């Protein structure tokens, strides 16, 4: 990785799969993670289906790549994005990729990029398949970026995160029953790339933990420590 304060990211949008109305929120999120130095959006701009994207490209500082589909089956924009990603990878300039899509076709690409040691962040909708979510270092749900309410059936409550915390503690496997909050968060993220405290209604892990009935916390120096509440 290059010696810089913020990771240099290549951001690749699948315009056929992600609505343009989400672009602002996505770019804000990416900017909070690193420097989105390369921003490309892929689609068939002759089809008329991407009018909303066409109207935002210059405003958002995106570079549009034309991929005209002349065959049935595999989406031409998917192929174009994959080819570009490999060219960018071999250029050796970037620390990581952000793939903006909910399409499982990019699972193999994400895996290939990670094999070369690059960080891969996926951003997509809740419909994104588990295979794509799990192959990324981190997967961010668009619904969490725009504050779109989840259907009651799929809405997660704070206490639903307790099993993830217990699993993280098992992974860490230490003798002391007090765990550093940052250590817990990293263990959860490693096991569940799509973990996001916003899914449970809280912006930070500390706020989520405070809302849990089954844990207790204490300060130790500058660290917040936590453990499972003991029975009785």
Language-model segments: what does each one mean?
Residues 1-84, 89-90, 119:
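Domain-level signal for Mg2+-assisted phosphodiester chemistry and nucleotide/NA-binding surfaces
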Residues 49-54, 124-134:
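Short, glycine/polar-rich helix-capping loops at beta-to-alpha or helix-loop-helix junctions
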Residues 130-143, 147:
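Contiguous mid-protein beta-loop-alpha structural module that forms a pocket-lining wall or clamp
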Residues 60, 116, 135-136:
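Short, structured coil segments at secondary-structure junctions
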Residues 39, 107-111, 116-119, 129:
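P-loop/Walker A NTP-binding module and the surrounding RecA-like catalytic core of P-loop NTPases
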Residues 148-232:
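N-terminal regulatory modules in eukaryotic regulatory proteins
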Residues 12, 42, 95-102, 109, ...:
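Acidic beta-strand-to-loop metal/phosphate-binding motif
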């Amino acid at each position: 990785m290059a010696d810089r304060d913020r990771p240099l990211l290549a951001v690749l949008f699948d315009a056929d799969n992600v609505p343009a109305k989400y672009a602002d929120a996505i770019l804000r999120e990416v900017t909070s993670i690193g420097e989105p130095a390369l921003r490309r959006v892929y689609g068939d701009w002759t089809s008329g289906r991407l009018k909303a994207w066409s109207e935002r490209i210059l405003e958002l500082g995106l570079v549009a790549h034309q991929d005209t589909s002349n065959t049935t089956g595999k989406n031409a924009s998917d192929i174009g994005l994959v080819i570009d990603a490999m060219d960018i990878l071999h250029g050796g300039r970037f620390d990581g990729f952000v793939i903006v899509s909910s399409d499982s076709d990019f699972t193999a690409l994400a895996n290939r990029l990670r094999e070369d040691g690059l960080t891969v962040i996926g951003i997509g909708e809740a419909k994104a398949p588990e295979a794509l979510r799990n192959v990324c270092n981190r997967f961010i749900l668009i619904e969490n970026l725009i504050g779109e309410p989840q259907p009651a059936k799929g809405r997660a409550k704070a206490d639903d995160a307790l099993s993830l915390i217990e699993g993280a503690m098992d992974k860490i496997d230490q003798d002391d029953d007090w765990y550093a909050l940052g250590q817990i968060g990293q263990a959860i993220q490693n096991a569940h790339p799509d973990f996001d405290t916003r899914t449970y209604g809280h912006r930070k892990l500390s706020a989520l933990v405070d809302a849990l009935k089954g844990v207790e916390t204490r300060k130790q120096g500058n660290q917040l420590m936590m453990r499972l509440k003991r029975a009785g």
